[in-house]
Amino acid sequence: MDSIAQLRKNYTFGQLSETEVPHHPLPLFQLWFDQAVKAECPEPNSMTLATADKAGNPSARIVLLKGADQNGFTFFTNYESQKGQDLAVRPQAALLFHWHELERQVRIKGLVERVSATESDEYFHSRPPASRIGAWASPQSAAIPNREFLEEAEKRFKSEFGEAPPRPEHWGGYRLRPTEMEFWQGRPSRLHDRIHYKLDGSNWKVTRLAP
């Protein structure tokens, strides 16, 4: 651990100019995401989701992006989990994508809402049966006595539902509607490129931030 302070890297992969980016952040996100896929970045749809509880205590965890369009960024989870409890009282969140191989980050802030039951059903039934059973078996974020508790619950719900488990009411999707997005491109000498989008009415204001 003594060598942590000495870990460093020079960023030389690319550059980003505020005069060349699109007026709306979504096309740039989609371009960067596609490039992350082509570069074979590990799990390019993995993102940090940061929430806060009623008292303002923050929590962060990795979740998977399952949709990105003009309506926002979609992910799915247990509504009774810590993140679900946080979003019930504070429906604001932040997302962070880090594509190390491309020396890029994307930060997103916005308001969060549940997706429709129809949309949750559609995604839930596209998942493998074992994952659908897992949504029933795990009381996410609750204290449990041991691993056997989960395994017994899994057996019980497999016996009850077979290969066609329905979506539990406590499981579904959220959509973050962005109000701010920042695109970060690593550059030499730590003089990184940071292009910031902020929603102003129905338009996006684009500015360059100091690194």
Curated annotation (Swiss-Prot):
UniProt record, GO biological process? pyridoxine biosynthetic process
Q: Where does substrate bind?
A: R8, K9, N10, Y11, K66, Y123, R127, S131, R190, L191, H192
Q: Which cofactor does it need?
A: FMN
Query: Under which main EC class is this enzyme filed?
Result: oxidoreductase
Pfam families per the UniProt record, alphabetical: PNP_phzG_C, PNPOx_N
Residues that bind FMN, according to the entry?
Answer: R61, I62, V63, L64, L65, K66, F76, T77, K83, Q105, Q140, S141, W184, R194
Q: Which GO terms describe its molecular function?
A: FMN binding; pyridoxamine phosphate oxidase activity
Pathway assignment: Cofactor metabolism; pyridoxal 5'-phosphate salvage; pyridoxal 5'-phosphate from pyridoxamine 5'-phosphate: step 1/1; Cofactor metabolism; pyridoxal 5'-phosphate salvage; pyridoxal 5'-phosphate from pyridoxine 5'-phosphate: step 1/1
**Enzyme Commission no:** 1.4.3.5
Keyword Oxidoreductase assigned:
yes
Q: Which UniProt keywords apply?
A: Flavoprotein, FMN, Oxidoreductase, Pyridoxine biosynthesis
Q: Which SUPFAM superfamilies match?
A: FMN-binding split barrel
Cited Gene3D superfamilies: Electron Transport, Fmn-binding Protein, Chain A
Q: Return the cofactor note field.
A: Binds 1 FMN per subunit.
Q: What does this protein do?
A: Catalyzes the oxidation of either pyridoxine 5'-phosphate (PNP) or pyridoxamine 5'-phosphate (PMP) into pyridoxal 5'-phosphate (PLP).
Homology family: Belongs to the pyridoxamine 5'-phosphate oxidase family.
Protein known as: Pyridoxine/pyridoxamine 5'-phosphate oxidase
Q: What is the scientific name of the source organism?
A: Polynucleobacter asymbioticus (strain DSM 18221 / CIP 109841 / QLW-P1DMWA-1)
Lineage summary: Bacteria, Pseudomonadati, Pseudomonadota, Betaproteobacteria, Burkholderiales
